[in-house]
Amino acid sequence: SSAASDVYKRQARNSSATNKNSLYDSYLRAFRWSIDRIGTHGVMAFVSNGGWIDGNTADGVRLSLDDELSDIYVYNLRGNARTAGDVRRQEAGNVFRDGGRTTIAIIIAVKREIPDDVCIHYRDIGDYLSADEKLAIVDRSTFDNIDWQIIDPNIYGDWLNQRDEDFETWPVLGDKNSDDIPAIFKNFSAGLKTARDSWCYGSTPSAVTSQMQTLITVSYTHL
């Protein structure tokens, strides 16, 4: 689809990750679609999975947002249940309760007709808060009373937990793109991958059935 193509061209292309499958998630496609539909100026807003805020794979997403938007407001509501120990207790409640296990974030972004340097406004809601406490805080929040932190991203697309520049000088485990970079492993593989995940799920059983039938038909024509 054109949305998937745009994700590849503008977000996946800028990512330093080898496995870019997570960049084709629906919410990231929605970001890309919205920025394109805004045109020269406008506003977009989403409540989304927040893994893109600091995920290594999402560096291309952040670089794309930095490059194309003027003001970005990110309210990190935390709630990541895919953690353990004290980190899990810090993440605490998810605002979608049993309906969500990932970090939840609110993003509001402005694109101006005259390009200028992006300003990233970030707020972490805090540690050890229940879902009810988080929702109460959000209910009382306005742009004016939120204590925004201004983020100065680095050239690698890091917003939070920015990497040490010396990291780039370390040997890599492996590199398929260059023989000049010192690497520990010369040959390596991620194993067998179908790369057909997006065909295998949908909003209804009939939609999944239709997608799978199409996939099988097309596959047979190429045998």
Regions found by a protein language model. Name each.
Residues R10-I35:
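Glycine-rich S-adenosyl-L-methionine
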Residues A3-Q11, T221-H222:
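Conserved small/polar residues in nucleotide/adenosyl-binding loops
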Residues A17, W33-L223:
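Sequence-level detector for compositionally biased, low-complexity segments
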Residues S5, Y27, A58-R62:
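Amphipathic alpha-helical segments in well-structured domains
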